[in-house]
Every structure is written in structure tokens, then in C-alpha cells.
Amino acid sequence: MKTNILKGLLIAILFLQGVTVSSQQGQNDNTKKRQIVLFDGKSTNAWKDIKSDHFPDSGWVVKDGVLTVLAKTDNQAGGHDIVTMEQFSGFELELEVRLSEGANSGIKYLVTNTYPGSKGQYLGLEYQLIDNEKHPDALLGRNGNRKMAALYDILPARENIKINPPGEWNKVKIIVDGNRVEHWLNGEKVIEYDRTLDCFKELVRITKYNKLENFGGQEQGHILLQGHGNEVSFREIRITTLE
């Protein structure tokens, strides 16, 4: 029984990564595009701490045109997650990311405050950022779905992708066009999936997100940069809306 389930999920993964949604072909022909710089190398006005209504006073630094979340150490707490002030539906997000050795982080999108309250918890689909060689979480999950550029805990990126090592910059792009989503890394598309397909929903069902109503089905949400206890740097963050 377990073997049949795993085979079915593997087939689903292969299908999702090769899917073409014909109903959305040409959808962008009449869209109104709006380009927004989310980080220009200086200003953090587009972002806020998930625990407040403003950019964090500590844990993140801007230097030489780079936005960096600090690592958690014995002497410093490290940075919290930050989210965009604005919410987005259809968009093309582009940025460059530099991991420190052994780092683990992520870029979440279509993020909502799932558990509002004094602290809140912002959850959404996640583009995994991780040092595949040095962080143990990369070996967990299923079929590589916690490795670099994966849709965290749901879908793995395709094999043999080009990843620049820690200390070097990687170019990341995330496209959300209706229900079709793409992950890109260093100029190559590494994942494509449709959020409405039953096979996608089945993959969500076997994750820790299975108790969240309509996880992954949000029409709009924030962009989130994750503070996960490791130093990670970001630059050239911009988004083009597809409305």
C-alpha cells in the first residue's frame, strides 16, 4: 500500500514539474504591469517585522547595498522574519540571495497572518534557500523537497540545477500567474506547478500544512524573507505585478 502511494506521488511530482496550463496561455497579453522596487540598496520602507508594524530595530542590517539577516549567536538574537507592507496576487519576484555556510532560510509568498494575535504567524508557500551540503534539513523531507529552490516540504526542484556555493550570489525568480507558479534559479526554471490540481493538494495533505484550510490557495498575500538563525543576504529585490 505504501509503495503504491509513493509511486503515485512521484508521478504527481513529475507531472507537476512538467505541467502546462493551457487555460492560462496568453493570460498576460492584457495584464497591467506595475514594477516595484522592494529594496534599492538603502531603503527598507517596503518591509516590516512580523511582530510589529515597522522594520525591525535589530537583527537586520543594510550595508553596501545589501540587506542581511544576522545569525543567532550567544551574543545576538538574530533577525525575525520580515514581510512586505503590501500584498500581491499575480507577480514576478526577482532578487539575488547569498547564503552563509550551512545556512537555512526561505522566501515565502502569498503569505497571510494565519494565526492573528499578539505575535501572529505568517505562513505561505516557500521557496527553499539552504546549503544542501552543510545543513541537515536538506536531507529530510521527501524526494529532495527540502533542498535548494524546492517548494518547501511539497515539491523538489528538478535534478542537476546550477547552484552557486555559499558566499556567492544566486539569482532567484518566483512567478505567480493565476494558479500557475514557477521557481527559477540562476536563469533556469526548476519547478512549475498548478495550485488547483488534485495531485498538488494531495502533496500538501501529507505535510505539516494539512490542518490549514486552503493552504496554498490564497488569492493574494505578502512576500516574506525568513530569519531562521543563519546569516543570509539579499539584494536587488524587485517585483512586477501581473494584474
Q: What are these language model-derived features?
A:
Residues M1-Q27:
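Bacterial Sec-dependent N-terminal signal peptides
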